[in-house]
């Protein structure tokens, strides 16, 4: 859900995750982008202390690793002074986490706002503002995140900026959260090679790409984006690596199947050197099944002997961190999908055992077919790299 950030700032957001990357790598990523910035915002995920193992991997841990203050955003809907007990708990739970101030969300009236500000006065913590309920900013959700398809993003961004400026004390917020960036942290220098790398990307079916991955790939050559829904976007013969990231192919199955020239070119080249993650892997199946009664399916690339079902009857949430060792490289990532593999050829087996965040085995498959690597897992290779995964490095 980083599309708001990119729309408002004009630059992509980067991933900071203590499960998927080392503390040193997180510092390098943060410093490399913070050293020339005026303002840096690290958005927390879930609750402040929610991690993959108690508070490990939580927003609180990231704040400690990067030495950043925390602005606590509190949902004040249908609540008032009872929130004081909760906020007090956040303030005292971990003395190493600095809570710089509080923003209340969904305040209902002037009197409600007055009551909320009294909480901060009594707890001696700055109140940075109270955001009122505002239906125009309410976003619909869908099974894998926020749904931006029905909104005018330009209008939303402008409206949001006006509301924040009116209801938050932005100058004070920037003042009390100001910190020096540790520019002594060494940032690895990029290398420069001349590979030819093609990446599937559009607004829907191939829309989930870590910005770090694009930075990484750009070190190894020229990155060209293509839209698999565009039948003229045929993958050329001289491509060294084909990257099919995640997205919502189930929402665009008809459009994907209606581009047979692209399908044929992807099938011809993906085996030479390719990575397919989640939606990208679904695209490589023989069919994407949308309904079983009546049977409705769309032809996909057919590089992997299996089908993928996005039928309501088959949909089950698979979510969580994943890790595995492959060819001497420890890879980590995240899995989040509802579709599932069906009619899998018995010869198509996982190349490795995959584990969850606590080290317990899960049935997520990592397919190794010729020089293709495919899985439901969105891998993070901003730190580990990917070239050692291939039996033959693409392009060599």
Which positions does each model-derived feature cover?
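ATP-dependent carboxylate-amine ligase catalytic core
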Residues: 1-66, 74-98, 110-114
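C-terminal and late-domain segments of enzyme folds
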Residues: 6, 170, 190-193, 207-216, ...
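Short, surface-exposed amphipathic charged segments that create phosphate/polyanion-binding patches used
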Residues: 30-31, 137-152, 238-243, 320-322
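Structural motif
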Residues: 41-43, 71, 75-76, 103, 105-108, 198, 200-204, 376-380, ...
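Internal gly/pro-rich beta-alpha loop/helix module
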Residues: 81-189
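Phosphate-binding active sites in nucleotide-utilizing proteins
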Residues: 195-200, 204-268
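Cysteine-nucleophile active-site neighborhood
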Residues: 249-323
């Amino acid at each position: 859900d980083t599309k708001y950030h990119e729309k408002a700032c004009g630059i992509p957001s980067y991933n900071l995750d203590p499960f998927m990357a080392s503390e040193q790598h997180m510092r390098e990523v943060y410093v490399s982008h913070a050293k020339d910035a005026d303002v840096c915002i690290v958005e927390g995920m879930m609750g402040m202390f929610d991690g993959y193992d108690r508070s490990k991997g939580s927003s609180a841990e990231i704040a400690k690793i990067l030495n950043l203050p925390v602005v606590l955003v509190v949902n004040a809907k249908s609540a008032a002074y009872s929130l004081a007990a909760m906020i007090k708990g956040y303030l005292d739970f971990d003395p190493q986490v600095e809570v710089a101030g509080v923003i209340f969300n969904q305040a209902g009236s002037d009197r409600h706002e007055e009551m909320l500000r009294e909480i901060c006065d009594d707890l001696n913590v700055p109140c940075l503002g109270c955001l009122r309920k505002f239906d125009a900013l309410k976003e619909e959700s869908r099974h894998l995140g926020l749904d931006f398809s029905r909104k005018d993003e330009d209008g939303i961004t402008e409206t949001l900026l006006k509301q924040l400026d009116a209801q938050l004390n932005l100058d004070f917020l920037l003042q009390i959260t100001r910190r020096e960036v540790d520019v002594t942290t060494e940032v690895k220098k990029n290398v420069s090679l001349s590979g030819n790398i093609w990446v599937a990307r559009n607004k829907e079916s191939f829309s989930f790409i870590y910005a770090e991955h694009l930075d990484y790939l750009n070190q190894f050559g020229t990155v060209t984006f293509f839209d698999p829904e565009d039948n003229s976007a045929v993958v050329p013969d001289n491509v060294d690596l084909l990257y099919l990231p995640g997205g919502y192919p189930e929402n665009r199955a008809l459009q994907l199947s209606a581009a047979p020239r692209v399908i044929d070119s992807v099938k011809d080249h993906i085996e030479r050197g390719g990575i397919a993650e989640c939606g990208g892997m679904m695209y490589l199946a023989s069919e994407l099944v949308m309904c079983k009664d009546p049977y409705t399916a769309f032809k996909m690339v057919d590089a992997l002997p299996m089908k993928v079902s996005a039928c309501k009857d088959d949909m089950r949430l698979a979510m969580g961190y994943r890790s595995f060792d492959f060819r001497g490289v420890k890879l980590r990532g995240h899995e989040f999908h509802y579709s599932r593999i069906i009619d899998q050829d018995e010869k198509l087996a996982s190349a490795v055992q995959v584990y969850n965040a606590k080290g317990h085995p899960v049935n997520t498959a990592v397919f190794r077919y010729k020089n293709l690597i495919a899985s439901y897992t969105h891998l993070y290779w901003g730190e580990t790299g990917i070239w050692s995964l291939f039996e033959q490095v693409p392009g060599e």
